[in-house]
């Protein structure tokens, strides 16, 4: 036994009567494994000299009455000193003012079991038979009151293999040092002040709330620790359960309780128990890894220390050792996982406040402990920030223990004022999430999963907030931001956020709208550039066309110059040469000699049959001359190649265009009025049909 823990109450009993779902069950040498019924009971005042624990127990061989405890403050209701619980122990509103450990145990006589349950430094410790004792701890002191919630599992083997468990909660009003305030179960606090000095002088007696995150008016929620035990399993056989954290819905067979809003909710789940610790805590320090090994509440059996590591890069808390342990059915941590949805409202009178509760199923004895500090506000309805400053993360986190204790936590959502702190397990930027809730996630793997690296703090869709406009007052919590801040990268503390409303949804959407505008401007600029490129291409095409036109014009000009030079030299020009100057000239020249221009028919589009019919209709139309007229008017001579002049002329004369034969020596040639020469017989036949030059289309022979 740890000498710091002091004596423990030991009782014995071989017979118990347990009540499960209204039926009495006779059990010999077995621990209490029943569904606890909530009752309103205050804490007894058993003051003893300083430094010694006080024991108050109630033993009975009949069905036992189990109570629910809640610490609170109120000045309008009678204190617990005027109340007597159902088992006859009168409670007092006075709390010890020294370091005395008060243990209230409910059990059977004649049994020897390990004491565990709920213990407050200088406060109350629930005995071995108290299970399913959710405590609603409310602080009323204006001074900061660091809290350290330790959830541990104790698996002791005694007469009936009684398995007990519980929750250890420490309140230290004398200081805020994390290293000195985190104590093992049963260790005495070393603070000079009273552990309960900051608490109110009275306790409210109210029904158990359906959700641990429901807070009463005038109270400051800081820690909600709930352990539940189910009696749906009939046997006490142990089974191996992997320590996993997953999500499930509450069992339908669970009894219902009514919260202070009048809303009925399920309190228990089927198959095992669950442990929940809820609080709205924040962190003012960014650490890469939080690893901690706890201490077993009753160190009767040595166990292996297993350290969990929470990193900003991962999504789960992974142990360094094995977590496979055999867990009895009556262990309060054996239960299907359950997560309850949460809704946020700004007011405490009209809205329903729920929170996301993470239940830890099938957790073994090797459960680690996260310690945090809490600061209570003086008689205020709003929760104050719970910080984990850098200077408080001392060697206490690095010192391995022989046992592991770990609370499961869910945040309180009754946020009526902006919270100034951030909760960060890992280093990062505080602006990674805005207007969000702490939603721990779970998975079916063997490792205990922690919140995802970059969670979105969004209320569940099935429970929308009653006043969404006030949700912006929530602090921008950031669990695992992916963006590292310069101070966090150097190991320094993360600066606190300023007070005031946080960024609204409109401001959050501003970067996306600016991005869209930048994209639109980029598209607009790209369109303008494309238009300019098209214009440049068009200009290039026009330039090429102009260059081609210029080349054509230059060619035409050169041809005209050649024709002019030929005319100046007196050379014979053809009709094509005149067409160079103007195409209309050639058209006028052809029309000039067409006497029957008005009588012309469009023979180009006429078929062969139409042309034959036209010839028969018109008849033979002859414009030629007779042979006698031709012989008289046409000049005739013989072609000779012997004379130099004839040789030179012969070289320049083209062949006969009618018969396409070259002129030979001694051929009779005929010369027309225009000067063109042909064979005499060829041109005579041509002029007899048509009095036109076959080359220039001018009048061949002049008639009298």
UniProtKB/Swiss-Prot annotation:
Gene3D superfamilies: Zinc/RING finger domain, C3HC4 (zinc finger). Residues 184-196, 245-255, 485-505 have a biased composition (Low complexity). Its EC number is 2.3.2.27. Residues 452-467 have a biased composition (Pro residues). Keywords: Flowering, Metal-binding, Transferase, Ubl conjugation pathway, Zinc, Zinc-finger. Residues 43-61, 281-290, 300-329, 340-354 have a biased composition (Polar residues). GO terms for molecular function: ubiquitin protein ligase activity; zinc ion binding. One of its GO terms (biological process) is vegetative to reproductive phase transition of meristem. The keyword Metal-binding applies. Disruption phenotype: No visible phenotype under normal growth conditions, but the double mutant plants mbr1-1 and mbr2-1 show delayed flowering. It comes from the Eukaryota. Residues 1-20, 37-61, 176-197, 245-354, 381-403, 436-525 are annotated as: Disordered. Pathway: Protein modification; protein ubiquitination. It catalyses: S-ubiquitinyl-[E2 ubiquitin-conjugating enzyme]-L-cysteine + [acceptor protein]-L-lysine = [E2 ubiquitin-conjugating enzyme]-L-cysteine + N(6)-ubiquitinyl-[acceptor protein]-L-lysine. E3 ubiquitin-protein ligase that functions as a regulator of MED25 stability by targeting MED25 for degradation in a RING-H2-dependent way. Proteasome-dependent degradation of MED25 seems to activate its function as positive regulator of FLOWERING LOCUS T (FT) and is important to induce the expression of FT and consequently to promote flowering. The RING-type zinc finger domain mediates binding to an E2 ubiquitin-conjugating enzyme. This is E3 ubiquitin-protein ligase MBR1.
């Amino acid at each position: 036994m740890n000498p710091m823990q002091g004596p423990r109450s030991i009782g014995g009993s071989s017979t118990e009567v347990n009540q499960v779902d209204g039926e009495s069950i006779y059990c010999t040498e077995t621990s209490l494994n029943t569904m606890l019924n909530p009752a309103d009971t205050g804490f007894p005042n058993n003051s003893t000299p300083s430094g010694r624990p006080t024991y108050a127990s109630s033993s009975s061989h009949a069905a036992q009455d189990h109570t629910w405890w809640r610490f609170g403050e109120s000045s309008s209701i009678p204190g617990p000193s005027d109340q007597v619980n159902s088992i006859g122990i009168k409670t007092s509103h006075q709390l010890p003012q020294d370091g005395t450990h008060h243990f209230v145990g409910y059990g059977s006589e004649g049994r020897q079991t390990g004491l565990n349950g709920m213990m407050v430094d200088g406060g109350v410790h629930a005995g071995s038979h108290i299970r399913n004792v959710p405590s609603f701890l409310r602080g009323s002191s204006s001074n900061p009151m660091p809290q350290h919630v330790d959830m541990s599992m104790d698996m002791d083997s005694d007469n009936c293999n009684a398995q007990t468990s519980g929750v250890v909660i420490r309140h230290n009003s004398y200081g805020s040092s994390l290293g000195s305030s985190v104590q093992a179960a049963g260790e005495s606090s070393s603070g000079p002040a009273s552990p309960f000095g900051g608490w109110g002088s009275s306790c409210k007696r109210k029904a158990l709330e359906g959700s641990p995150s429901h807070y009463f008016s005038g109270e400051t929620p800081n820690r909600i620790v709930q352990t539940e035990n189910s009696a749906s399993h009939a046997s006490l056989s142990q089974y191996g359960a992997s320590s996993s954290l997953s999500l499930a819905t509450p069992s339908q067979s669970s009894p219902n309780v009514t919260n202070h809003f009048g809303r009925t909710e399920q309190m228990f789940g089927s198959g095992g128990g669950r442990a929940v610790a809820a609080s709205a805590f924040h962190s003012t320090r960014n650490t890469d890894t939080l690893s901690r090994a706890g201490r077993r509440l009753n160190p009767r059996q040595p166990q292996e220390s297993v350290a969990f590591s929470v990193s900003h890069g991962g999504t789960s808390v992974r142990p360094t050792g094995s977590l496979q342990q055999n867990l009895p059915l009556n262990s309060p941590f054996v239960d299907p996982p359950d997560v309850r949805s949460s809704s946020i409202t700004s007011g405490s009178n009209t809205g329903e406040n729920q929170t996301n509760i993470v239940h830890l199923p099938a957790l073994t004895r090797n459960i680690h402990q996260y310690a945090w500090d809490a600061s209570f506000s003086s008689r205020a309805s709003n929760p104050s920030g719970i910080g984990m400053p850098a200077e408080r993360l001392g060697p206490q986190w690095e010192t391995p223990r022989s046992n592991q204790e770990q609370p499961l936590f869910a945040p309180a959502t009754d946020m009526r004022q902006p919270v100034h702190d951030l909760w960060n397990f890992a280093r990062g930027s505080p602006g990674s999430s805005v207007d969000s809730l702490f939603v721990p996630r779970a998975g079916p793997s063997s490792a205990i999963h922690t919140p995802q690296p970059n969670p979105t703090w969004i209320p569940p869709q099935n429970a929308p907030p009653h006043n969404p406009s006030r949700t912006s007052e929530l602090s921008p919590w950031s669990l695992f931001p992916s963006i590292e801040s310069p101070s966090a990268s150097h190991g320094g503390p993360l600066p606190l956020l300023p007070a005031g409303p946080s960024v609204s949804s409109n401001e959050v959407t501003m970067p996306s709208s600016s991005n869209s505008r930048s994209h639109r401007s980029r598209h607009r600029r790209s369109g303008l550039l494309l238009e300019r490129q098209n214009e440049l291409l068009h200009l290039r095409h026009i330039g090429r066309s102009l260059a081609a036109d210029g080349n054509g014009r230059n060619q035409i000009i050169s041809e005209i110059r050649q024709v002019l030079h030929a005319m100046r030299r007196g050379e014979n020009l053809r009709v094509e040469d005149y067409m160079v100057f103007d195409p209309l000239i050639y058209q006028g020249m052809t029309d000039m000699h067409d006497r029957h221009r008005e009588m012309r028919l469009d023979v180009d589009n006429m078929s062969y049959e139409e042309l034959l019919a036209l010839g028969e209709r018109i008849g033979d139309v002859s414009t030629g001359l007779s042979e006698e007229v031709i012989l008289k008017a046409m000049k005739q001579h013989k072609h000779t190649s012997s004379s130099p002049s004839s040789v030179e002329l012969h070289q320049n004369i083209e062949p006969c265009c009618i018969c396409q034969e070259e002129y030979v020596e001694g051929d009779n040639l005929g010369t027309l009025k225009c000067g063109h020469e042909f064979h005499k017989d060829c041109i005579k036949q041509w002029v007899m049909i048509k009095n036109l030059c076959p080359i220039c289309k001018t009048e061949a022979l002049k008639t009298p």
